[in-house]
């Protein structure tokens, strides 16, 4: 392959892609739900993490919306859980999916949705959404 046709790469590796996913996060505690069929929206407007390649901070808004089944998320432990991401090198897409998995593990909701709305980096902003139950292959507009 000539230099002219050489494919450019960003330098991201599989290690970058998996960065942060082996972190031991603190548990998210719960408390017994007393009602049925309502939604809870938890909003973290100052969510921060770190790019695993550059080490630069990422800023955004993280929202967790869910319908509780038997338990609700305890907010102080959730805050401590989210603080774990502050100095953690992890991709934005992985943050949203990891938070969703940990919320589901903690409280087994009827359904849940986590949205990460990250501020622009190089002129491009990112919004990542993950839902439970997972609906793989479903067209989403």
Residue map of PLM features:
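N-terminal intrinsically disordered, cationic/polar leader segments
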Residues: 2-138
């Amino acid at each position: 392959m000539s230099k002219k046709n050489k494919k450019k790469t960003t330098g991201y590796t599989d290690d970058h892609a998996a960065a942060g996913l082996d972190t031991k996060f603190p548990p998210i505690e719960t408390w017994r739900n007393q009602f049925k069929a309502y939604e809870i929206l938890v909003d973290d407007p100052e969510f921060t993490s770190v790019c695993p390649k550059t080490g630069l901070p990422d800023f955004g808004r993280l929202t967790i919306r869910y319908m509780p089944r038997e338990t609700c998320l305890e907010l102080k432990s959730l805050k401590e859980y989210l603080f774990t991401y502050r100095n953690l090198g992890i991709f934005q897409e992985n943050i949203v999916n990891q938070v969703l998995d940990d919320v589901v593990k903690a409280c087994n909701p009827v359904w849940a949705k986590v949205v990460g709305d990250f501020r622009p980096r190089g002129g491009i902003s990112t919004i990542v959404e993950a839902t439970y139950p997972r609906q793989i292959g479903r067209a989403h507009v």
